[in-house]
Amino acid sequence: MFSIQQPLLVFSDLDGTLLDSHSYDWQPAAPWLSRLREANVPVILCSSKTSAEMLYLQKTLGLQGLPLIAENGAVIQLAEQWQDIDGFPRIISGISHGEISQVLNTLREKEHFKFTTFDDVDDATIAEWTGLSRSQAALTQLHEASVTLIWRDSDERMAQFTARLNELGLQFMQGARFWHVLDASAGKDQAANWIIATYQQLSGKRPTTLGLGDGPNDAPLLEVMDYAVIVKGLNREGGHLHDEDPAHVWRTQREGPEGWREGLDHFFSAR
């Protein structure tokens, strides 16, 4: 068992978890965000989104200054007080966005895979795809270590594409709405472990960890947490963990921020 009073880190996915998949509403989670902030419990956002997008969301959610995990773990935005850490303000894993883009353009040109990346379109098109404002959509294009795309080919071709990327040291990952290409060495789990180790080094004690996510791409993150909340997903398969001991893993009945709140209620309110 654990409590909100002990050293604790909360790691949370965004779309479909803390944010509603369509409206991006987070208000159902607001009371718990306030309570965690008052208790000095860091809420560390983890997403496929760019660091620029997530810094904007951090401010909106009242979480500014905390570390975050962007681009599925390929980018770690460091906490404001970690200025002495090499790489401040961000640590980037693997090859850059530009290098990945070159690989994808070559595969598309020579092997005729069909897909559209966020680099292929303008912010107005992304706003139409996502429901974001144009200014927010522009932030989605500021990738540093990954590429976001829409797959427009067959499942058979996708398998071939994935294999080619793997040969080149890259991975192909499904998100809530889009697909993402990033370095094979990057991941939300590795990034989370690095952040946990940093907090442990600074405080002298390993914090207890709670993670929340809704999709298969969140499973690696949840696997390295002490406690996990699998938020009910909308029209997609939820994550599956190797060990779903009910004492440590809770599957919600509600979706999005309602499920996020349900998960916090389950692990804290009953204790």
UniProtKB/Swiss-Prot annotation:
Enzyme class of the recorded protein, top EC level: hydrolase
GO biological process, one term: mannosylglycerate biosynthetic process
SUPFAM superfamilies (UniProt xref): HAD-like
GO molecular function, one term: magnesium ion binding
One Pfam family it belongs to: Hydrolase_3
Catalytic activity, EC: 3.1.3.70
Residues bound to Mg(2+): 13, 15, 214
Catalytic-site annotation from UniProt: 13
Reactions catalysed according to its record: 2-O-(alpha-D-mannosyl)-3-phosphoglycerate + H2O = (2R)-2-O-(alpha-D-mannosyl)-glycerate + phosphate
Keyword Lipoprotein: no
Keywords tagged on the record: Cytoplasm, Hydrolase, Magnesium, Metal-binding
Cited HAMAP family: MPGP_rel (MF_00617)
Protein family according to the UniProt entry: Belongs to the HAD-like hydrolase superfamily. MPGP family.
Name of the protein described by the UniProt record: Mannosyl-3-phosphoglycerate phosphatase
Species this protein is from: Escherichia coli O81 (strain ED1a)
